[in-house]
Amino acid sequence: HSFPTRRSADLALDHGAVPMTARVPRCVVDLNRGPDEIDPLVVSGVAPAALNPRIMAGLGVIPRVVSQGRAIYDRPISLAVAQQRIERLWHPYHRALAALIDEAVARFGGAILIDMHSMPRDALAHLPRPRPDFVLGDRNGGSASTRITSEIASAVQAEGFRLRRNSPFSGAYIATTYGRPRQNVHVVQLELDRSLYMNERMVEPRVDFGAFALRLERILKRLAGLRPDACDSSIAAE
């Protein structure tokens, strides 16, 4: 997903990682949801069946709310519009992502996907202080090996950032779907507090953006050096 600076994506590429950036605003279609996670309060003509907590919270594949529970729509959209978004935006992204993973497995015997997101500061408002700067999610050990998760955590903490694991975000559709550590495919979700690099109210970079970008680049350099290991004995029980 989106990096705070293009230099960070370029650096990852320089060190052998392949950056893949989502260009679709999450309020249009959420790529970290399943294509069937459709909210009947947003999309007309959908039966209210099999509602999971994400859909009930208004955070399905077509989100109903943004931060602080603010409504996106004043009326439901049609099922045809929702299906068009999913077909034109969701499916191409996931086809490309699956192809990259398959290519890595074919060439190197395994793959590591670091699914990076930024989160609004208020997403952590309910947590006790000091609040984390990053939240690492590996589905509580289900989407990545302990070794790889620990190395990612170490890279973040080495730059002085506070990190929390699997709470309040343990990973969603991407980690659940693509994380197969026993097949040497590891997925870790990294949520970073966007107030670290931008003024959220003014929607502009902070004055110390450059210093943050350098810290993030050092993290990405370490992450780009990670290697999957088919003999890794630290894979958590699924």
Each language-model region and where it sits:
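Short, small-residue-biased leader/transition segments that mark boundaries at the very start
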Residues: H1-S8
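Short, glycine/charge-rich beta-strand/loop segments that flank catalytic centers
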Residues: V18-G34
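C-terminal helix-cap and adjacent tail motif
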Residues: L51-V65, N140, A144-I148, I152-Q157, ...
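Catalytic cores of processing enzymes, dominated by hydrolases/peptidases
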Residues: P92-M198
